[in-house]
Amino acid sequence: MDGMPDAIAWRDVGSIDDIPPLGARVVVAPGGNIAVFRTGDDRIFAVDDRCPHKGGPLSQGIVHGARVTCPLHNWMVDLASGEAVAPDSGCTRTIPVRLDGRRILLSIQTGA
């Protein structure tokens, strides 16, 4: 180990048009599946595709506003923070995401 931090790379994972409004898409990544969400007002969020409660697939949940409801036990997760909405508690990892025109880019750590 040389003490150097891992490099950050932006990975193109498709077009915003590939995800319906209030929908999601799964991106397979080395660290596990990532759920990429599109809100009704075309905001894009990305989180680990695992509910902090029992590991349910958030990508199969219902998107409302900037939240998703897990399909297993109806936990709500804030897509911006990854935090479960009270009274539930827990957190799923968020992944930096940006739009370049209509292209969705995820920030993926790579070994430098």
For each feature predicted by the language model, list its residue ranges:
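N-terminal pre-ligand scaffold of iron-sulfur
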Residues: 1-65, 91-112
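Short cysteine/histidine-rich metal-coordination sites, predominantly Zn2+-binding motifs
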Residues: 65-71, 84-93
